[in-house]
């Protein structure tokens, strides 16, 4: 525990590059392009990549306030998982169940598409497709797992995608405490997100795209992005700003920036790894409501995250001091040791935080207004590593007017209502988190589903 205070306050993923993270020049005065993309994370880079792959003649400009990978794309848990936040049922309500399941299957396939691009572009980001394992550590969690498997079978999803694990099988994957059962989800991989986002940026440049960093976009209107450093004129403008959407004029209530924190251990020995499992490097968590997440890195560290406190700052503020809050990282460490007590004496070398973005309807999506030429993609609720690829591919098809199967998926055209003004946003987050935390505590203590607490949390989430 003492090592936590001495850990580097920096993302593990961005701490090993020999080159400068700030290697690209800012915008230098007005410029005209075909497509301007605001945001140098996964969403913006994948959009640019597929645009240029399909039409190399396009003039594509990415505008990044800091450097590529500064935001969630360089700070996340490295879960490249073929799943979307929000749930199939919500997408079915705005289309049909068949279409919602088509979106689900397309997400399953997206992990392999990402691997294809990484291989073809020679991007070494420690990609390893070891699946995802969620262990149930109390009876309500186990019951939810069984219900999830039953529902998957009813909808035609087979064991090659998702299957139940008994207690022994689950412990063989993740040797956690109090394991009742588990779920194995095959279309999931681990990545080093920093290597992935930096490699993707270079791939975009090789294809002819231009990236300006240290460039602050202030506002978007038809055909124009106003930046501190100059005005960008463009036929199409794509907003890919995720947790930093509040920085764009008039967009403060579009997405809620919520904090997540991570820690990374020192590299483990072979004997330590044998004690905790994770032999095939699956991503892992348990079935609690306040999400935790982890992976074993290619150099045998455990990178582990969770929400901590506070999850949200009044007025949608983003504060780097909060990202490195020691108390929040202590909560993450306690969750890790509660799950895997074998690691209680292992040193923590890095601790960091970042923001994820939540739309009011909790549904990720994308849209392109043909009249104004302005598009948006994101709102991934913390599950954007793989989803951003599908969103970027789809946005490219919309811009190029390609009649692909992607442009009719039911997350295309999703538009959430805006978040409530303060203090309602702040109160809503605090109440929702308190009820979910109470549900986790109650279920562990009583071994019964916390129905009332979760009903209130679902109402606040708009479920």
Model regions: which residues?
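Extreme N-terminal leader/targeting segments of oxidoreductases
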Residues: 1-35, 53-59, 458-462
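Internal hydrophobic alpha-helix adjacent to the cofactor/substrate pocket in enzyme cavities
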Residues: 52, 387-409
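Dinucleotide-binding Rossmann-like beta1-alpha1 core, especially the glycine-rich loop
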Residues: 83-167
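Active-site substrate-recognition segment that forms the wall
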Residues: 120-128, 219, 231-271, 275-372, ...
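Helix-rich C-terminal "cap"/substrate-channel and partner-interaction subdomain
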Residues: 321, 339-342, 359-364, 375, ...
């Amino acid at each position: 525990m003492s090592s936590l205070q001495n850990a580097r306050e920096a993302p593990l993923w961005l701490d090993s590059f020999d080159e400068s993270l700030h290697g690209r020049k800012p915008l230098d005065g007005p410029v005209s392009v075909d497509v301007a993309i605001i945001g140098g994370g996964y969403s913006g880079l994948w959009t640019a990549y597929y645009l240029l792959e399909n039409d190399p003649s396009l003039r594509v400009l990415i505008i990044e306030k800091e450097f590529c990978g500064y935001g969630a794309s360089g700070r996340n848990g490295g879960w490249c998982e073929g799943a979307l936040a929000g749930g199939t049922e919500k997408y079915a309500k705005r289309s049909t169940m068949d279409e919602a399941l088509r979106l689900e299957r397309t997400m399953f396939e997206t992990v392999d598409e990402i691997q294809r691009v990484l291989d073809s572009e020679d991007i070494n980001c420690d990609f390893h497709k070891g699946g995802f394992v969620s262990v149930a550590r109390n009876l309500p969690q186990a019951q939810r797992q069984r219900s999830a498997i039953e529902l998957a079978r009813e909808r035609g999803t087979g064991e090659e995608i998702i299957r139940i694990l008994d207690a022994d099988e689950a412990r063989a994957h993740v040797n956690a405490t109090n394991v009742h059962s588990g779920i194995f989800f095959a279309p999931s991989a681990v990545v080093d997100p920093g290597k992935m986002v930096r490699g993707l940026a270079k791939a975009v440049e090789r294809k002819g795209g231009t990236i300006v960093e240290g460039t602050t976009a202030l506002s978007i209107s038809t055909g124009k992005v106003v930046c501190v450093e100059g005005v960008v004129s463009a036929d199409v403008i794509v907003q890919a700003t995720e947790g930093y959407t509040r920085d764009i004029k008039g967009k403060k209530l579009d997405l809620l920036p919520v904090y997540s924190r991570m820690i990374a251990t020192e590299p483990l020995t072979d004997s330590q790894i044998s004690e905790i499992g994770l032999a095939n490097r699956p991503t892992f968590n348990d079935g609690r409501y306040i999400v935790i997440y982890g992976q074993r890195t290619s150099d045998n560290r455990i990178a582990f995250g969770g929400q901590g406190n506070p999850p949200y700052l009044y007025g949608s503020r983003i504060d780097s001091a909060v990202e490195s809050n020691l108390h929040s990282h202590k909560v993450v460490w306690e969750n890790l040791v509660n799950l895997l007590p074998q690691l209680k004496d292992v040193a923590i070398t890095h601790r960091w935080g970042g923001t994820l973005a939540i739309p009011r309807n909790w549904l990720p999506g994308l849209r392109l207004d043909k009249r104004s030429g302005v598009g948006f993609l994101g709102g991934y609720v913390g599950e954007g590593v793989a989803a951003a690829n599908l969103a970027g591919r789809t946005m490219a098809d919309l811009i190029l007017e390609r009649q692909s199967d992607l442009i009719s998926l039911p997350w295309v055209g999703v538009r959430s209502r805006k978040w409530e003004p303060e203090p309602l946003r702040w109160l809503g987050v605090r109440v929702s988190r308190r009820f979910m935390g109470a549900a986790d505590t109650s279920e562990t203590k009583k071994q019964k589903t916390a129905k009332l607490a979760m009903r209130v949390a679902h109402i606040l989430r708009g479920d």
